[in-house]
Amino acid sequence: MINRFSIEKVKGLEIVDSRGNPTIRVFIRTSDGVESFGDAPAGASKGTREAVEVRDENGLTVKRAVDIVNYIIDPALHGIDVREQGIIDKLLKDIDSTENKSKLGGNTIIATSIAALKTASKALGLEVFKYISGPRLPKIPIPLLNIINGGLHAGNKLKIQEFIIVPIKFNTFKEALFAAIDVYRTLKGLITERYGKIYTAVGDEGGFSPPLEDTREALDLIYTSINNAGYEGKIYMGMDAAGSDFYDSKKEKYIIDGRELDPNQLLEFYLDLVKQYPIVYLEDPFEENSFDMFSQLQNKLSSTIITGDDLYTTNIKYLKIGIEKRSTKGVIVKPNQVGTISETFEFTNLARRNSMKLITSHRSGETEDNFIADFAVGIESDFIKVGAPARGERTSKYNKLLEIENKFGLEYEGKYFYL
């Protein structure tokens, strides 16, 4: 008797991401004819420990990745029960046999891993988030909306990569999201008034990139927008510094706002900002090997969620170091950083056991697939980062969360969140 869940076909397809770059989509079909797909997102700012993508012609094609799926992965997965996520992911890792997934490619592997999970949930007639969460009743995570871009995501002189708003004190996700959209619109008007309409064009993640040079200029703009929109005390602020991107390893200095700061001076810089503005979230404040500096900052800012992205790269090996050193309260969760869904689950489970906040995140190069929204709800993520409320590949994730809330009546994480 044929198992209706057995994998019959795995197929790769070269598609286009939100930055106009090629990426890979992997389809998996079962013997019962059930089919779904997984897309590989791509980051602009990457940690050095991330899984390596397979690309050709200076990144202009992923034809080799498609061939790997069609000629290596397809026969290897043929006949395996699509519900066996752990077996599928282990087989992919074994075939690859490298620590950084460089043989098959992190992009190839994560697209296949996502496709397996989505196909299994579809075959069982379950929503993806329900397939992940099981019998537990999860909540809708708090959105972290990146509304001003700097660093590698922008063409201005800001060194901080993302300036974020955090709508916490609302009863529903819908209320929180639409309040954040009010602030986004208010900011757009403020930028138009001060700098001209040309600077309201949006960047890779939907945020604005006004001609700013100083961190406080950006924070002032957002703080004013929050107050003008009437959400003081309900919408807070955050930053993704992407500290590795403005760290000069030769000088051992951070180059920011026209100054060269040593690690301790940068720590004081952040302490001053948190005193001046309602900042509750700070991601990658230092370069990716500075576990001790992260720890010092978190110790001084007990009410702020210091978070590691490049510090951990969704890798349990580095998370264990952060736990031992008490480096952060929060962890970024990006499945494509580590390469498989199973490894991502291991990472989130360890973080949860150590009372750390989960922040599920997109990448700057995304597709219209809304898998990450389902994934965030399913793993009971505290927060979700999918960009500004603009551009289809970002809004598709917000719309999926609105749909889940409306259809299943899930409560909003922010309703119960205390600072």
UniProtKB/Swiss-Prot annotation:
<keyword id="KW-0964">Secreted</keyword>
<dbReference type="InterPro" id="IPR029017">
    <property type="entry name" value="Enolase-like_N"/>
</dbReference>
<comment type="pathway">
    <text>Carbohydrate degradation; glycolysis; pyruvate from D-glyceraldehyde 3-phosphate: step 4/5.</text>
</comment>
<comment type="function">
    <text>Catalyzes the reversible conversion of 2-phosphoglycerate (2-PG) into phosphoenolpyruvate (PEP). It is essential for the degradation of carbohydrates via glycolysis.</text>
</comment>
<dbReference type="InterPro" id="IPR020810">
    <property type="entry name" value="Enolase_C"/>
</dbReference>
<dbReference type="GO" id="GO:0006096">
    <property type="term" value="P:glycolytic process"/>
</dbReference>
<protein>
    <recommendedName>
        <fullName>Enolase</fullName>
        <ecNumber>4.2.1.11</ecNumber>
    </recommendedName>
</protein>
<dbReference type="Pfam" id="PF03952">
    <property type="entry name" value="Enolase_N"/>
</dbReference>
<feature type="binding site">
    <location>
        <position position="364"/>
    </location>
    <ligand>
        <name>(2R)-2-phosphoglycerate</name>
    </ligand>
</feature>
<dbReference type="GO" id="GO:0000287">
    <property type="term" value="F:magnesium ion binding"/>
</dbReference>
<dbReference type="GO" id="GO:0000015">
    <property type="term" value="C:phosphopyruvate hydratase complex"/>
</dbReference>
<feature type="active site" description="Proton donor">
    <location>
        <position position="205"/>
    </location>
</feature>
<keyword id="KW-0963">Cytoplasm</keyword>
<feature type="binding site">
    <location>
        <position position="283"/>
    </location>
    <ligand>
        <name>Mg(2+)</name>
    </ligand>
</feature>
<dbReference type="InterPro" id="IPR036849">
    <property type="entry name" value="Enolase-like_C_sf"/>
</dbReference>
<feature type="binding site">
    <location>
        <position position="161"/>
    </location>
    <ligand>
        <name>(2R)-2-phosphoglycerate</name>
    </ligand>
</feature>
<keyword id="KW-0460">Magnesium</keyword>
<dbReference type="InterPro" id="IPR020809">
    <property type="entry name" value="Enolase_CS"/>
</dbReference>
<dbReference type="GO" id="GO:0005576">
    <property type="term" value="C:extracellular region"/>
</dbReference>
<feature type="binding site">
    <location>
        <position position="363"/>
    </location>
    <ligand>
        <name>(2R)-2-phosphoglycerate</name>
    </ligand>
</feature>
<feature type="binding site">
    <location>
        <position position="240"/>
    </location>
    <ligand>
        <name>Mg(2+)</name>
    </ligand>
</feature>
<feature type="binding site">
    <location>
        <position position="385"/>
    </location>
    <ligand>
        <name>(2R)-2-phosphoglycerate</name>
    </ligand>
</feature>
<keyword id="KW-0324">Glycolysis</keyword>
<keyword id="KW-0479">Metal-binding</keyword>
<keyword id="KW-0456">Lyase</keyword>
<feature type="active site" description="Proton acceptor">
    <location>
        <position position="334"/>
    </location>
</feature>
<feature type="binding site">
    <location>
        <position position="309"/>
    </location>
    <ligand>
        <name>Mg(2+)</name>
    </ligand>
</feature>
<dbReference type="InterPro" id="IPR000941">
    <property type="entry name" value="Enolase"/>
</dbReference>
<dbReference type="GO" id="GO:0004634">
    <property type="term" value="F:phosphopyruvate hydratase activity"/>
</dbReference>
<comment type="similarity">
    <text>Belongs to the enolase family.</text>
</comment>
<dbReference type="GO" id="GO:0009986">
    <property type="term" value="C:cell surface"/>
</dbReference>
<dbReference type="InterPro" id="IPR020811">
    <property type="entry name" value="Enolase_N"/>
</dbReference>
<feature type="binding site">
    <location>
        <position position="334"/>
    </location>
    <ligand>
        <name>(2R)-2-phosphoglycerate</name>
    </ligand>
</feature>
<dbReference type="Pfam" id="PF00113">
    <property type="entry name" value="Enolase_C"/>
</dbReference>
